[in-house]
Structures are given as C-alpha cells and as structure tokens.
C-alpha cells in the first residue's frame, strides 16, 4: 500500500501543475558530466558543460564528482528516473524522521502513515517540485542532515553526514 501511495505521490506534482510530462533534469545532467570528467581525468573547473545550449560550470567540490561518477555509467533517462524516485523516497523518510521527533509518543507505524499522507502535499510545494524538475540533490542533503541530527540511535558518529 505504501509503495502505491509513493508511486502516486511521485507523479502527482506533474499532474497537478502541468499535466504529465517529463522534465529535462538539467542539474542532474551537470552532476553526470562532472562524474564523466572525473572518470576521464579531465579538469572539472576549466570548462563549462553544454546543456540545451546553456553553458553550465561544475560548481561542486571534487568529492561530489567522485560521488557522481557512477551516474556516468548509466543512461541519462534511467539515472534521472532513479534520482526522482530516490528523492521522493528520501522526502518520505525525512517526513518520518521529523514526525518521530515532533510526536515522540507515537508508534513508528503511525509516523509512516502520517508521512504517507503528507508526502503528496509536500511534493507540490514549489521548492520540492523544482528540486524534482531540475534533478537536484537538495532533498538528499536534507535527509543526510536529518539522519545525522534527529536519529535517536545513530549508527555512525554524529556529524558524519553534515
């Protein structure tokens, strides 16, 4: 049931906003190009990467290029779809973490159900909708910060993900 709701929630912003259409995830493509440049041994910062006639620089730290390198091995469309699905799942998990922190007396199941109901609304909010349309990592970074700061029993030392 949760999987079905997540799938519906993933497409809801497009249905509400502009109807079903696929966005070109321009930022995701820059991440891929940075990963490709790293794998090829190219300098990340001496050239721009052309995306739809727009020249964009790779503005992320070198570690990001290393982390983005696996994206160069998969087709753009599969990577963009995977990024969208991972972002939606991460957003759901962020809502669960915040709900657990804000409503500590409830069972974990209650937090997951609440997150499932909140997720479709969260997906149509402009910052989240644009994160999805550009293929950005914002929600993934937020998830890392929340896991690092609000998890009750962290499995890594605090501060690792920040």
Annotate each PLM feature.
Residues 160-162:
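Transmembrane helices and adjacent periplasmic/lumenal helix-loop junctions
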Residues 66-70, 127, 143-147:
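Alpha-helical transmembrane segments of multipass membrane proteins
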Residues 2-6, 118-119, 141:
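Hydrophobic alpha-helical transmembrane segments of polytopic
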Residues 129-138:
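Short acidic/glycine- and proline-prone juxtamembrane loop motifs at membrane-interface regions
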Residues 76-78, 110-115, 153-158:
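Membrane-helix interface segments
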Residues 114-123:
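Short helix- or helix-capping micro-motifs
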Residues 139-157:
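Specific aromatic-rich, kink-prone transmembrane helix
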Residues 1-111, 130:
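TM-lumen/periplasm interface segments of multi-pass membrane proteins
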